[in-house]
Amino acid sequence: MYPRSRVVGPGLGTSSSSRDHAGAGQHGELDLQQNQRQNLEVAEPKGPKLERQGHGDQRSTGTYTLIAPNETRRQKIQRIAEQELADLERWKQQNKAKPVHLVPQRLGGSQSEAEVRQKQQLQQMRSKYQQKLKRDEAIRIRKDAEEAELQRMKAIQREKSNKLEKKKQLQEDIRRATLREHHQSKTAELLSRLDTDRTNRSACNIAPPAAQSSRWKLPVLLRDPSRAGSQAHKDSPQKEDNQKLQKTRDGHQKNKLLETKGQHQEEERAQIHQAEHWRVNNAFLDRLQGKSQPGGVEQSGGCWNMNSTDGWGI
């Protein structure tokens, strides 16, 4: 094994220990030079191979390889570092805190201590009422918001109900129009049938004399049961239609009579109510007139209102 020894190449300068302890400069340098010589002497018998490696910037001594520093690069790095330090110092000088210049003033405000304490006491006394006012204001704001929301919902529901009402009204109008058309068509059909029956009946009534004479001559043909049944079958729809028309007319007349009777009753009721109102007013005015007179009821001999319908005697 190679002996362990401290080796410092030429140009590396002092080691880290020499930088930390600058007081032991010469003694440390002598020790380093002696150790370097011993290492070189030990490395010489190794042969020509180590001599070839020692040429140039690299030099191998035992287990260590010494590399000489690049002076140009080192100087460049140092120059850049110095420039940056100078820039930093310049920036610090430019951006250092400036002195503050304030106008001197009297501290403590323009009020005395007694006034301040009195103001604090008043604020303390009013704080309870101020908190109550704040709570009331918050409650009022919340109620206003709730009322606005309720009104908005009511408006929405009202709009929905209006739309539904319009839809129902439209359906009702369509239904009434359909019913009216159906009624008109049925009425026209009934009238056309009645006109047809009337024309047929008039044609039957206006028969030729030969037919009438044959009827008198051939009474057996008129008494034929098959012809009688067919004639009855033809007359039955006409009778039903006539009955329906008669019932409809009777219903209209009855409704008109009921409406007229109701109007008369309403007029009589209104007249009775008006007469009663007049009677009560006259009685009240008579009582007021009797109270305003000096003798009152005694001067009138017990009959204080002979003209009014509400008069009475003692």
From Swiss-Prot:
InterPro entries with a match to the protein in the record: EPSTI1
Location of the region described as Disordered in the Swiss-Prot/TrEMBL record: 1-72, 200-219, 225-267, 292-314
Domain of life: Eukaryota
UniProt biased composition (Basic and acidic residues): 43-58, 232-267
Coiled-coil regions listed in the entry: 71-180
One example of a Gene Ontology biological process annotation: macrophage differentiation
UniProt keyword terms in alphabetical order: Coiled coil
Compositionally biased tracts (Polar residues): 305-314
Role according to the record: Plays a role in M1 macrophage polarization and is required for the proper regulation of gene expression during M1 versus M2 macrophage differentiation. Might play a role in RELA/p65 and STAT1 phosphorylation and nuclear localization upon activation of macrophages.
Protein name as annotated: Epithelial-stromal interaction protein 1
Organism: Rattus norvegicus (Rat)
